[in-house]
Regions:
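A short hydrophobic beta-strand element within the catalytic core of glycosyltransferases
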Residues: 168-169
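Donor nucleotide-sugar binding/catalytic pocket of nucleotide-sugar-dependent glycosyltransferases
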Residues: 1-36, 112-115
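Nucleotide-activated donor-binding/catalytic signature segment of Leloir-type glycosyltransferases, i.e.
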Residues: 95-160
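Short alpha-helical segment that forms part of, or immediately flanks, the ligand-binding pocket
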Residues: 158-159, 181-186
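Aromatic "clamp/platform" in nucleotide-sugar-dependent glycosyltransferases that forms part
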Residues: 173
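Nucleotide-sugar donor-binding and catalytic loop/hinge architecture
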Residues: 30-50, 77-80
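Conserved donor-binding/catalytic core segment of Leloir-type glycosyltransferases
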Residues: 44-61, 67, 85-89
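Short hydrophobic beta-strand element within catalytic cores of glycosyltransferases
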Residues: 190-194
Length: 195
């Protein structure tokens, strides 16, 4: 059943619709066993609580607000398990994430990111330790970088990355219904978005 057909049946014969920009077949919630397996493969605790953000590291993305909110949430709720922020972004542009984290009292150990290998194209979720890291998968030297417009992950890999998360948060100062928000919804994540 299509939106075009529904609108036509309502008497709007001149209306046509276009398909959305997200290929929904790539984004879905993985079974819990697969989600745990991904965490274990990346040395992340089974019961850790992960808040994720998939974004281009631009100043219009409200990284300071997310860090401040995370710090307040931890201070007020005192979680009894490990918590992480997972930033799927390129660290060499935009916000100085570690510097901002320090301002809010957040340890660098609590911030994970996506590295992708320029040689084998496999990804790894781990703490940020700079660009040009050695790849544990293909043993490529200085071949791992944080995901960016020139070297990123495939849709099936991005789906796995969403499945590391327990909640998705997308704060920004301008823009619209951005693509990662919709992808996160397709993976059945609770999504927190700027109004």
């Amino acid at each position: 059943f299509s939106a075009t057909k529904a609108l036509n049946e309502m008497g709007h014969k001149h209306v046509k619709t276009v398909h959305g920009c997200i290929e929904s077949k790539y984004f879905f919630r993985l079974p819990d066993e697969e989600r745990l397996k991904l965490r274990r493969q990346n040395n992340i605790e089974d019961d850790a609580f992960i808040t994720g953000f998939v974004f281009r590291n631009q100043l219009r993305k409200s990284v300071p607000n997310l860090l401040e909110g995370y710090a307040k949430w931890k201070n007020e709720n005192k979680p009894n398990k490990k918590t992480y922020l997972l930033f799927h972004t390129y660290w060499k542009e935009g916000w100085g994430i570690h510097k901002l984290a320090e301002e809010y009292g957040i340890s660098h150990e609590e911030i994970l990111t996506t590295y992708v290998c320029r040689k084998c194209s496999r990804y790894q979720i781990k703490k940020y330790t700079g660009e040009d890291q050695n790849c544990p998968h293909c043993k490529g030297e200085k071949s791992q970088v944080t995901t960016n417009v020139g070297c990123g992950v495939r849709e099936n890999q991005l789906n796995e990355i969403y499945n590391f998360m327990d909640v998705y948060c997308h704060p920004f100062t301008s823009g619209g219904q951005e693509i990662p928000i919709q992808e996160a919804k397709l993976t059945e994540l609770i999504t927190l978005v700027t109004n």
